[in-house]
């Protein structure tokens, strides 16, 4: 039986957002990120801090997944994960990564390329302490990216960890920590009519950031 044809033209909304004058955009990409991120937090219905994280093995085989931004500033963009997961292994073996934020409500994207380094233990401990207790226990229960025979096994392991830490604070697992992405390239993309999109590229140099524009 033939699959129904998808009319992809109908998937695209014709709604437009107010025009941004690229000439008026900040020359500081981190300040511009702050501005766009603030708008996304106000307009996105779910997970405005969600970002795609692309990693690769040393021989160039890529993998991609969504993670949550948990900190950002002049020193980079921070996320947390299980260090023994697939992405944890790839990050340890190949520090070159890419991030992508896509905010549908604003019809904007931000692409970031750079390299990662682990956060220090104090930073990881401080963030872990802000997580809900069940999320903390979940970090102990999950052997992320390892084969799992059934959901029941996972739930039993979670219950086991609940019992283990009953009546006490849950410490951060040694295999769970954070990574900081130091950006080298940041591209801001804004949707425009007739696919005449605006692309503004910042590249880091030894003395700061350069700013330029790209054809869409």
From Swiss-Prot:
Q: Which InterPro entries match?
A: Pyridox_Oxase (IPR000659), Pyridox_Oxase_CS (IPR019740), Pyridox_Oxase_N (IPR011576), Pyridoxamine_oxidase_dimer_C (IPR019576), Split_barrel_FMN-bd (IPR012349)
Q: Which residues bind FMN?
A: 65-70, 80-81, 86-87, 109, 144-145, 189, 199
Q: Give any GO molecular function from the UniProt entry.
A: pyridoxamine phosphate oxidase activity
Q: Does the keyword field hold Isomerase?
A: no
Q: What EC number(s) has UniProt assigned to this enzyme?
A: 1.4.3.5
What cofactors does this protein use? Answer: FMN
The cross-references to Gene3D superfamilies, in alphabetical order and at most eight, read:
Electron Transport, Fmn-binding Protein, Chain A
- EC main group: oxidoreductase
What is catalysed by this protein? pyridoxamine 5'-phosphate + O2 + H2O = pyridoxal 5'-phosphate + H2O2 + NH4(+); pyridoxine 5'-phosphate + O2 = pyridoxal 5'-phosphate + H2O2
Which top-rank group of organisms is this from? Bacteria
Pathway the protein acts in:
Cofactor metabolism; pyridoxal 5'-phosphate salvage; pyridoxal 5'-phosphate from pyridoxamine 5'-phosphate: step 1/1; Cofactor metabolism; pyridoxal 5'-phosphate salvage; pyridoxal 5'-phosphate from pyridoxine 5'-phosphate: step 1/1
- Please list the GO biological process terms of this entry: pyridoxine biosynthetic process
Task: Kindly indicate whether the keyword Flavoprotein belongs to this entry.
Answer: yes
* Cofactor: binding comment: Binds 1 FMN per subunit.
Q: Which residues bind substrate?
A: 70, 127, 131, 135, 195-197
Give the record's keywords alphabetically.
Flavoprotein, FMN, Oxidoreductase, Pyridoxine biosynthesis
Function, in words: Catalyzes the oxidation of either pyridoxine 5'-phosphate (PNP) or pyridoxamine 5'-phosphate (PMP) into pyridoxal 5'-phosphate (PLP).
Query: Which family is this sequence assigned to?
Result: Belongs to the pyridoxamine 5'-phosphate oxidase family.
| Quaternary structure and partners | Homodimer.
Q: List the NCBIfam families.
A: pdxH (TIGR00558), PRK05679.1 (NF004231)
Q: What is this protein called?
A: Pyridoxine/pyridoxamine 5'-phosphate oxidase
Q: Highest lineage ranks of the organism?
A: Bacteria, Pseudomonadati, Pseudomonadota, Alphaproteobacteria, Sphingomonadales
Name of the gene: pdxH
């Amino acid at each position: 039986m033939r699959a129904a044809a998808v009319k992809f033209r109908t998937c695209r909304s014709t709604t437009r957002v107010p025009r941004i004058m690229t000439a008026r955009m900040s020359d500081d990409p981190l300040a511009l990120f702050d501005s766009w991120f603030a708008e996304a937090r106000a307009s996105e219905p779910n997970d405005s801090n969600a970002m795609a994280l692309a990693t690769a093995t040393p021989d160039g085989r890529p993998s991609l997944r969504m993670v949550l931004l948990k900190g950002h500033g002049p020193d980079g963009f921070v996320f947390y994960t299980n260090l023994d997961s697939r992405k944890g292994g790839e990050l340890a073996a190949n520090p070159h990564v890419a991030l992508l934020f896509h905010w549908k409500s604003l019809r904007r994207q931000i692409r970031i390329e750079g390299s990662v380094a682990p956060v220090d233990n104090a930073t990881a401990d401080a963030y872990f302490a802000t997580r809900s207790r069940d999320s903390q226990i979940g970090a102990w229960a999950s052997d992320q990216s390892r084969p799992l025979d059934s959901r029941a096994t996972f739930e039993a392991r979670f219950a086991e960890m609940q019992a283990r830490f009953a009546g006490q604070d849950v410490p951060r697992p040694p295999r769970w920590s954070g990574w900081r992405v130091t950006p080298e390239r940041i591209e801001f993309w804004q949707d425009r009519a007739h696919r005449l999109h605006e692309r503004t590229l910042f590249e880091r140099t030894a003395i700061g950031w350069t700013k330029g524009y790209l054809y869409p």
